[in-house]
A protein has these predicted regions:
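Conserved hydrophobic/aromatic beta-strand scaffold that supports enzyme active sites
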Residues: 19-21, 30-34, 54, 74-76
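Short, charged/polar surface micro-motifs in flexible loops or helix N-caps
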Residues: 27-29, 36-41, 100-101
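Short histidine-centered beta-strand/loop micro-motifs
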Residues: 21, 32-33, 42-49, 65-67, ...
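Glycine- and acidic-residue-biased ligand/ion/polar-headgroup-sensing regions
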Residues: 39-64, 71
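Residue-level marker of beta-strand positions
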Residues: 73-74, 82
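A short, N-terminal "cap"/entry segment at the start of jelly-roll beta-barrel domains
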Residues: 1-29
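Ligand-binding loop in jelly-roll beta-barrel domains
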Residues: 68, 79-104
Length: 104
């Protein structure tokens, strides 16, 4: 995955999670999230998305209040749905936020 390090500027949250912003225009963002295999269970805080959220699990596994999503899963969260995602194993997720993120 050398391309990740060469082409992405990462923001490290210090919780085992880092974010790489691929695109942003106004409130719309396309980002990569990478979580270590040893990430703390509360590394992602409860949040919602005014315009919904779509994500593709590229590696690892994500789970939240609504289900478990292994690598290859495409997930859509409806507008204003609040969730608290967790990860299992080293995880890489491609995420689209049409209208940003809101803390719950």
């Amino acid at each position: 995955k050398a391309w990740l390090e060469e082409n992405i500027r990462w923001k490290d949250f210090g919780t085992g999670v880092r974010l790489g912003r691929l695109y942003r225009e106004d409130a719309c963002s396309l980002v990569l999230y990478e979580a270590d295999s040893e990430v703390t269970v509360d590394a992602f805080m409860p949040h919602s998305h005014p315009g919904g959220e779509a994500y593709l699990v590229l590696e690892g596994e994500v789970w939240d209040e609504d289900g478990t999503y292994p690598a290859g899963s495409i997930v859509w969260m409806n507008r204003e749905t609040t969730h608290t995602p967790k990860t299992r194993g080293k995880t890489l997720i491609l995420v689209l936020w049409p209208e940003g993120v809101k803390s719950a």
